[in-house]
From Swiss-Prot:
Belongs to the cytochrome P450 family. Keywords: Endoplasmic reticulum, Heme, Iron, Lipid metabolism, Lyase, Membrane, Metal-binding, Microsome, Monooxygenase, Oxidoreductase, Steroidogenesis. Pathway: Steroid hormone biosynthesis; Steroid biosynthesis; glucocorticoid biosynthesis. It comes from Bos taurus. A cytochrome P450 monooxygenase involved in corticoid and androgen biosynthesis. Catalyzes 17-alpha hydroxylation of C21 steroids, which is common for both pathways. A second oxidative step, required only for androgen synthesis, involves an acyl-carbon cleavage. The 17-alpha hydroxy intermediates, as part of adrenal glucocorticoids biosynthesis pathway, are precursors of cortisol. InterPro entries: Cyt_P450, Cyt_P450_CS, Cyt_P450_E_grp-I, Cyt_P450_sf. The keyword Membrane applies. It is an enzyme of class 1 (oxidoreductase). Substrate binds at residue 202. The gene is CYP17A1. One of its GO terms (biological process) is glucocorticoid biosynthetic process. This is Steroid 17-alpha-hydroxylase/17,20 lyase. It catalyses: a C21-steroid + reduced [NADPH--hemoprotein reductase] + O2 = a 17alpha-hydroxy-C21-steroid + oxidized [NADPH--hemoprotein reductase] + H2O + H(+); progesterone + reduced [NADPH--hemoprotein reductase] + O2 = 17alpha-hydroxyprogesterone + oxidized [NADPH--hemoprotein reductase] + H2O + H(+); pregnenolone + reduced [NADPH--hemoprotein reductase] + O2 = 17alpha-hydroxypregnenolone + oxidized [NADPH--hemoprotein reductase] + H2O + H(+); 17alpha-hydroxyprogesterone + reduced [NADPH--hemoprotein reductase] + O2 = androst-4-ene-3,17-dione + acetate + oxidized [NADPH--hemoprotein reductase] + H2O + 2 H(+). It is found in: Endoplasmic reticulum membrane; Microsome membrane.
């Protein structure tokens, strides 16, 4: 027994002991590190990690490293270095590390978001972008789809008769239906049990990802039971069962003459690969049902929670700044009025609303730390050596809260995105990357920006958003997972009197 224990400990020591680096190379300054546990004892344990990493810059500078188990992670907290990683050397840092919980979520790095660099990731990212291109014009135009769901949402809110409600569920339904239309060309009904199941799955996944899972740091612990891993497996299984039912129906009824959604594009690519009508990068094995499910799962996971969360953050900040809300509504009244629906072309005229959206994305970034990248070759950042296989994380929170780049970064100031006249949108700093950049940038950025503008302009056109009668304002602290979520809150929603009067006049013979 003692011999087995000794062998086990020696094996651990070999696996987790810091490896020798290249002789003479200059590396990022590192936190202290111990055998087996790495820098874990020296990392702050309390508070939000993105803020803790930002705080460590005071001692270690805008680029530093630490070890978790056997892995070295480099943390980036300056826009110039971040742009080098994401843009200038985007291909060199386009890998994704293997992480136990994310491996389950992505079915061993399938899909787009968590897939490692390679033919599979490149193919599925290209196909997803092709799907979004379907929705540029005509009956499938993205703007039309978003406005349909925004109208359904507003009609529901009008039935609440001024009650204070949590926007999470109706917002999630609206955004889920937009994603569903892009993926499958159909929408869920409010009472559909599949919709509730999808929402529960997303909540469960985010709950697991919001916790520190030791197995992510020490893969050797996989021999022991883990409640977090079991929960993740259950969520992914439920999600795949729901999506697989849709996939099989779509495959049965598929016609190459009618390509109208992401699933059609994936199936057509599979047909082409099977018939040898595709390029060498479209291997049929990369388009199995499991690969398709992972990609659809990524689009649902990333597309629903992110947009829903940002809209709630915008509403929360408007509740804290009622005079700003009033100014935005005045702009909407003067520029759009009440007889037509806001359109994307209004974005350059409703500049205060657009500046408010951009400021929310700055002060409360969707992903305060971007999904980790991985060096796929030996490379460098600045004059520092980065070995192949090193994880690299961009701390978006640090970029968006740097006092060197932003005046009073902790204050909510939409005017920072406007010129001195307040009539033109500007880009005040390069230290602003709400959707990432480069080869790993968010594939749904265009969709998200349109959703945020159209939903908020429609809501503010029709409703007054007020603090509930109990006077309780939403907390602006947030809860970090892959997505920076706002804590649950309620908002009192009343149909604007000016809207009522305009509708009454419009219905008069």
């Amino acid at each position: 027994m003692w011999l087995l224990l000794a062998v086990f400990l020696l094996t651990l020591a070999y696996l987790f002991w810091p490896k020798t680096k290249h002789s003479g190379a200059k590396y990022p300054r590192s936190l202290p590190s111990l055998p087996l546990v790495g820098s874990l004892p020296f990392l702050p344990r309390r508070g939000q990690q993105h803020k803790n990493f930002f705080k460590l810059q005071e001692k270690y500078g805008p680029i530093y490293s630490f070890r978790l188990g056997s892995k070295t992670t480099v943390m980036i907290g300056h826009h110039q270095l971040a742009r080098e990683v994401l843009l200038k050397k985007g291909k060199e840092f386009s890998g994704r590390p293997k992480v136990a919980t994310l491996d389950i979520l992505s079915d061993n790095q399938k899909g787009i978001a968590f897939a490692d660099h390679g033919a599979h990731w490149q193919l599925h990212r290209k196909l997803a972008l092709n799907a979004f291109a379907l929705f540029k014009d005509g009956n499938l135009k993205l703007e039309k789809i978003i406005n349909q769901e925004a109208n359904v949402l507003c009609d529901f809110l009008a039935t609440q008769h001024g009650e204070a409600i949590d926007l999470s569920e109706p917002l999630s339904l609206a955004v889920t239906n937009i994603i569903s239309f892009i993926c499958f060309n159909f929408s869920f009904k409010n009472e559909d049990p599949a919709l509730k199941a999808i929402q529960n799955v997303n909540d469960g996944i985010l709950e697991v990802l919001s916790k520190e899972v030791l197995l992510d740091i020490f893969p050797v612990l996989k021999i022991f039971p883990s409640k977090a891993m079991e929960k993740m497996k259950g969520c992914v299984q439920t999600r795949n069962e729901l999506l697989n039912e849709i996939l099989e129906k779509c495959q049965e009824n598929f016609s190459s003459d009618s390509i109208t959604n992401l699933l059609h594009i994936l199936i057509q690519a599979k047909v082409n690969a099977d018939n040898n009508n595709a390029g060498p990068d479209q291997d049929s094995k990369l388009l199995s049902n499991r690969h398709m499910l992972a990609t659809i799962g990524d689009i649902f996971g990333a597309g629903v929670e992110t947009t829903t969360s940002v809209i709630k953050w915008i509403v929360a900040y408007l509740l804290h700044h009622p005079s700003l809300k009033k100014r935005i509504q005045d702009d909407i009244d003067q520029i759009i009025g009440f007889n037509r629906t806001p359109t994307i072309s209004d974005r350059n005229r409703l500049v205060l609303l657009e500046a408010t959206i951009r400021e929310v994305l700055r002060i409360r970034p969707v992903a305060p730390t971007l999904i980790p990248h991985k060096a796929v070759i030996d490379s460098s950042i600045g004059d520092l050596t980065i070995d192949k296989g090193t994880d690299v994380v961009v701390n978006l929170w640090a970029l968006h809260h740097s006092e060197k780049e932003w005046q009073h970064p902790d204050l909510f100031m939409p005017e920072r995105f406007l010129d001195p006249t307040g009539t033109q949108l500007i880009s005040p700093s390069l230290s602003y990357l709400p959707f990432g950049a480069g080869p790993r940038s968010c594939v749904g950025e265009m969709l998200a920006r349109q959703e945020l503008f159209l939903f908020m302009s429609r809501l503010l056109q029709r409703f007054n958003l007020e603090i509930p009668d109990d006077g309780k304002l939403p907390s602006l602290e947030g809860h970090a997972s892959l997505v920076l979520q706002i804590k649950p809150f309620k908002v009192k929603i009343e149909v604007r009197q000016a809207w009522k009067e305009a509708q009454a006049e419009g219905s008069t013979p």
